[in-house]
Curated annotation (Swiss-Prot):
A motif (Q motif) lies at residues 53-81. It is found in: Nucleus, Nucleolus. It is an enzyme of class 3 (hydrolase). One of its GO terms (molecular function) is RNA helicase activity. It comes from Chaetomium globosum (strain ATCC 6205 / CBS 148.51 / DSM 1962 / NBRC 6347 / NRRL 1970) (Soil fungus). PANTHER family: RNA HELICASE. The lineage of its organism: Eukaryota, Fungi, Dikarya, Ascomycota, Pezizomycotina. This is ATP-dependent RNA helicase DBP4. GO terms for cellular component: nucleolus; small-subunit processome. It comes from the Eukaryota. Residues 284-439 form the Helicase C-terminal domain. Belongs to the DEAD box helicase family. DDX10/DBP4 subfamily. The gene is DBP4. SMART domains: DEXDc, DUF4217, HELICc. Its EC number is 3.6.4.13.
Amino acid sequence: MAAGNAKGGFAHRNKSVPKKTDAKSLKRKRGQEDLGKLKAAIEELDPKSPAIKQFTDLPLCEATASGLRASHFEVLTDVQRAAIPLALKGRDILGAAKTGSGKTLAFLVPVLEKLYHAKWTEYDGLGALIISPTRELAVQIFEVLRKIGRNHFFSAGLVIGGKSLKEEAERLGRMNILVCTPGRMLQHLDQTANFDVNNLQILVLDEADRIMDMGFQSAVDALVEHLPTTRQTLLFSATQSKRVSDLARLSLKEPEYVSAHEAAVSATPTNLQQSYIVTPLAEKLDTLFGFLRTNLKSKIIVFFSSGKQVRFVFESFKRMQPGIPLLHLHGRQKQVARMEITSRFSSAKYGCLFATDVVARGVDFPAVDWVVQADCPEDADTYIHRVGRTARYESKGRAVLFLEPSEEAGFLKRLEQKKVPLQKVNVRENKKKSIKNELQSYNFQSPDLKYLGQKAFISYTRSIYLQKDKEVFNFNKLDLDGYAASLGLAGTPQIKYQKGDDIKRLKNASRAAISSGSESDSDDEGKPKKDKKQVRTKYEKMAERQNQDILSSHYRKLLGEDGDAAASDDDDDFLSVKRVLADDAQIDAAAGGDATNTTTTEPKVIKLGNSELIIDSNRREKLLKSKKKLLKYMDKGTKLVFDDDGVARPVYELQDEDDFAQQGPAAALRQQFVAAESEKVKEADVDDKQAAKMRRREKRERQKARERGEELERVGAGGGGGGVAMLDGGEGDEGDEDPLALLRSLPIAGEESDGGRGGGGEDEGDDGEVEPPRKKARKWFQDDSDQEEEERQKKKKGGKKVIEMAEEPENLEDLEALAAGLLED
């Protein structure tokens, strides 16, 4: 039986059970079969089939399809319906669609499918490279990739700069998909040794027109040189380029041009309400502040042309508190701060974000109500991308553009060529509020804010000056003085790139002859030239010291202290003496050919007030730059005050003898002065008497109140619980009152009143005399020894009694009462 059982059990173990290796092989076989079916379905797929409406209609692997379902992506958009089938077939694509139409999924799905069909693993290296022009857009693409690719086994990385290059380099070798910006990627291709891109399968350029423009052209050219030519390339943007040079640069092979809205009436979404406002440059900030005050319950993005403008408007509006949360974002911020601000604005229900074009392309902020372009964009494409931050995914949105009067005609013509409809609106006068005075006050209080305002002015004017489209941007028509005043600046900052007449060249034109003659004479005499490396004294070094503050040089340039140097190409300092010149007679003689007087030079003399300053050394030349040191040569200022008649008079004005004599005889003036002072004394005496009378009255009232209080205490002590006190001494007293009864009734410090302990009958003895006060009752924690100790301590103090006084004695009666209390046993 046992053997049989053993045999039966052995036979049971020998049945065919699949091993692990068999399970893996079966799984691999099923995967190959599924992959073969997918490839066959892709070959049979018609890209222009109208039946393709959802992601389930596409031949996608289960990992991608499940990721799309989990992320709630079901229906295909127009650009996805046109681009994904072609990309699955391996074609190069040029995709163009309106903002917010789903271009990100149009290239992420082909990327995942491309690597899945190639059976890509972590050991195969980099398979897909996605390039974005901005860090914010790259982060957004990476987050979408993580959502839809959660079921794949590919490793993905984000390389956008702002972090340690060494840490990124250590992880690059293990990445299959990289989302990056052009500059950082090129840096890794040049410096990271173990980074290999020879097996790259697919290259994606999001916002390709921005990447291909002059700002990134050199980086893209260098980056493409590292990539293999057998790759598949996908280019997507809201405004696509068809230039042959761009296509040849990226080695595109027979690209398919996909435009989901090529036949559309407008290049912008139909549910986007667009308008523009013509506002002078000096009223731009006033209009913007009024706009924010009227849209407090909205989510707004305000675009400026430079980061300095963003910082100034944010800092100044933050002080004025328009009533809406404010944020700012520009390219000079740290990456951590940029990501935090992006996250805060995305999750906010209401708020205003001041930003540059770093968020103008591709970045998806949910539920944006308004897009305000405070500065005119450089072209129509930039306008389309900016307004694309609202009205995304069939939602509604509104956009408004601020145009300067000189920019209106030219820019509207550019927008008409791009099929962008705009409606002109006017600003209500009651909604305008001038903030110029407030900004000027803030600039006066904060030098840093004033510096930001100056830099904002310069950055804006520089951007206008460097624009290529001169039909739209005319620098000479700008009201620079009014714009500077609207920023709260006291004066218009100097602009170096605003060319004018070369004043220094014109000023020195008549001195050319004397300068050349003096140089030739010095050469003939054989005088040695000044050695640049000669030893300088410590005083000369002290005279050449400059302020090392980081803002000092900027302040000098902005305030125009460099003088003519701001309008010329030279960097020479203002009032720097180049050469000690002769007087006018010698200059005229030198110009006429008389070279005999050119060698005789005299020190230059400058008149400062009533004194003269002789410039005969380098130290005196440096003295001209110091206003503080020049004060001692100037006239001393006089301080004036205005009298009641509005006449300006010196602070210390003394009368002379003649002026005093005109007023009359001295005796009469003396009597007049004494009479006037007597009247003042009489008036003051009346007030003093009234004050003394009030003090006496208050004193009497206090005394009466004190007496009433003492009477009430005496009645309470004798009555024993509310009874009437007995004022006579009983039968044996014969009606005579005790004169010290009142004094004995005064409370003594350290003793308690016995009133209220018993009735009136208990306080009197059989003989009619008042009993002495009882001893203090013992507490529950005291015994006889404690009470005896207290009595002993009182005797040691000499039996001194302390009488509490409410106030100091004021008359004889008070003193007698006090003495009687002290003498009483």
